[in-house]
């Protein structure tokens, strides 16, 4: 049903809440409706990819430190919550607290949850500059 499709997800603020200072990443609880929909797409044949900037600011963009420290926490967390995936890419550039990601194939988490694949495609087509 979803063969040939890929969904690339951020983790923090998308799959789970953004960690507060007094919290640990291990204790974050994922959004149930997001996990359910990811599972449904994966079961339907879609590729699920996580692309995260977690700890890019903390480690000043040092991917080696992220691989050594952050990756194992994310892998254990995904396993704990049985969140399926095909790939995880670490080191997504972090735009800072006042920056943005601009992309013609971007949808917001709430749009992903409420819209069909066809509606998501139409939404992306409308936002292109061509």
What are the functions of these language-model segments?
Residues 1-130:
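Catalytic phosphate/metal-binding cores of nucleic-acid and nucleotide-processing enzymes, i.e., regions
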């Amino acid at each position: 049903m979803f063969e040939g499709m890929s969904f690339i997800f951020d983790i923090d603020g998308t799959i789970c809440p953004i960690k507060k200072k007094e919290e640990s990443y291990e204790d974050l609880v994922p959004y149930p409706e997001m996990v359910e929909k990811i599972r449904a797409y994966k079961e339907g044949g879609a590729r699920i990819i996580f692309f995260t900037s977690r700890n890019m600011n903390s480690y000043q963009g040092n991917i080696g430190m992220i691989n050594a420290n952050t990756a194992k926490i994310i892998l254990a967390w995904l396993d704990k919550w049985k969140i399926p995936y095909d790939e995880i890419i670490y080191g997504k550039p972090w735009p800072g607290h006042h920056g943005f990601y601009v992309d013609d194939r971007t949808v917001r988490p709430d749009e992903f949850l409420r819209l069909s694949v066809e509606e998501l495609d139409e939404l992306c087509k409308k936002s292109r500059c061509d």
